[in-house]
A protein has these predicted regions:
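Cofactor-pocket helix-loop regions in the catalytic cores of large enzyme subunits
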Residues: 1-217
């Protein structure tokens, strides 16, 4: 069946969850050498599409940045439930280290539309509609890059500038929001970025849609 499909030019699709294994990639490479019409398509139950697309746009590669909050003095989260399943990484351990009572205890501000585990632990929780959360994030970005007339954004910008590299902004929900958070953290030179990347998630929404078009073609 494989030889027949290959000879007739039909796609031979290997559908797999993210499998960041060099051995697996080599085996598929050998398989594709034998059957040139073979295609590898990745599908994950939790795809992290927006996170991966944002990383591709800002950093140039589809890999999730790894954070460490242990030495941060301020975290501002926009819809990011980072004590839950955020960015394919749990930040509970480094968050707990940063929240040890004392003069260096990290301040946590949560901007979100629905109560989350992370929001329940925040020093300050700012409840807003989803569209307003995104607007505030944009205003914070603007405030760090010229100015904003939004009072809440100005207050957050002042806090971020006061902490500088000891601050970090986390966002979730859309590619645009996550891109802005990355750009803000670059502006701050945030030390919460470890320089490491999580390569365990490889889902590509455009690639999966292409696979569906093959099925329907």
């Amino acid at each position: 069946a494989l030889t027949s499909a290959n000879t007739s030019g039909k796609k031979i699709v290997v559908l797999s969850h993210s499998f960041a294994s060099p051995t697996f990639k080599k085996l598929f490479g050998d398989f594709k050498t034998k059957y040139p019409t073979a295609e590898l398509v990745t599908y994950d139950a939790i795809p992290y599409t927006a996170n991966l697309d944002a990383a591709q746009e800002v950093f140039g590669h589809r890999a999730l940045p790894v954070y460490d909050l242990s030495k941060s003095k301020l975290v501002i989260s926009f819809q990011a439930d980072f004590l839950g399943d955020f960015n394919a990484q749990s930040l509970e351990t480094s968050y707990a280290a940063a929240r040890m009572p004392g003069e260096n205890m990290m301040e946590h501000i949560q901007v979100e539309s629905n109560m989350s585990l992370t929001g329940a632990n925040a020093d300050t929780r700012i409840p807003l509609k989803p569209s307003a959360v995104n607007k505030l994030l944009i205003e914070v970005y603007n405030g760090l890059n010229g100015g904003t007339s939004d009072k809440t954004a100005t207050d957050l910008v002042n806090k971020l500038q006061a902490q500088g590299s000891n601050a970090v902004v986390l966002a979730d929900g859309s590619k645009a929001a996550i891109v802005l958070s990355h750009l803000i953290n670059q502006k701050l030179n945030s030390s919460a970025f470890t320089g490491k990347a999580n390569l365990l998630k490889e889902y590509d929404g455009a690639r999966y849609q292409e696979f569906l078009s093959w099925m329907n073609g």
